[in-house]
Amino acid sequence: MFTYDIHAVYVKRQIYLRLSIEANSFIDAISEFFKKNKECINGVLDIYCKRPKSGDLALMAHYDGITYFYEGTRQTKYFLSTKDGGKYVWNGERFIMDDES
């Protein structure tokens, strides 16, 4: 397990959130962050993580949602795009790989 020092900027509300989380991976840490900060699920966030050696903050991911209509129903899908090109989708419990990307 690793300790992830997560820093998030809730873009539209201009709120800064910080949380240290122990997890096996960055995606697990971000999933835990969203479970503890449910108000962020409908937001737009820039997510930073503190580098272990230097202590500098590095932009690690961007979180946003898209709204679309499917069979006459309005739906929103929330995406996490990581700096290494990974695309994840929030399934209501955690982030999973987006099979459509």
What are the residue ranges of the model-derived segments?
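A short, exposed loop/beta-hairpin motif centered on an aromatic-Gly-Thr core
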Residues: Q14-S25
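Residues in flexible loops and secondary-structure boundaries
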Residues: Q14, A29-S31, D98
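Short aromatic-glycine-(Arg/Gly/Cys) micro-motifs in beta-strand/loop hairpins
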Residues: M1-Y16
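Short, mixed-charge low-complexity intrinsically disordered segments
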Residues: K38-S101
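A short, charged, amphipathic alpha-helix used as a generic interaction element across diverse proteins
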Residues: N24-G43
